[in-house]
Amino acid sequence: MDRWVNSNQQAHWDKRTFYRDARDPAAEAFSVPKIDWFCAELGIDTDATVLDVGAGTGMFTYWWSQRMPEVTGLELSENMIQRSAVPDLLQVGDAYELPFPDDSFDIVFAASLLHHLERPVDALREMRRVARRGVAICEPNRNHPPMAAFGVVSSVCRGLLHYSRHSLRGLAEEAGLDVRNVRLHGYIYENRSPTASVPIAKKLEAVLPGGAYILLAAAP
């Protein structure tokens, strides 16, 4: 198996112990609006199959499964799968060589994956290969000050400093994807926003431009 990430990153994911439970209200507030937007942009409602690449502990996998009939999560770290709320939906696999035939899933999705990869365009090409109807990508926004600060202090996440709306679109187009829309979204942080802060963060999301994450919807 070709390793997605370098040895330092792999050690981090294999040893990390804290992850927010997928069913936490903050996880729902973080995940569901993004899923709703992707479905609207790709013209997909509730009857679709989904592959979540780099699923981690399955936060998005869980919320996709609340909407779609068939969801599969692919993750490199067995440690993360063991800590998942939905381990039955996850399997070990390689983002550079997805173990599925062409056109296997309606939607191929990845969140906070590409900035950890040494060859993100190769991974996007694989996602395009197995997608029938759409590819949906969520990445941290380097132009969001708290996210940029996190990228500076965290060696594992330093790759996020390369990601903006423009750069993510460029990677997707280099991989041959037909980009439909790119937007910024979110003032809730995946594993860092206290649950009590969610109501305030939702109000900020409703009125403030920008956001901590870049969302890209594309056709294969």
What kind of region is each of these model predictions?
Residues 57-97:
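Class I SAM-dependent methyltransferase SAM/SAH-binding core
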Residues 117-126:
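A short, conserved alpha-helix within the catalytic core of class I
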Residues 160-177, 181-182:
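Short alpha-helix
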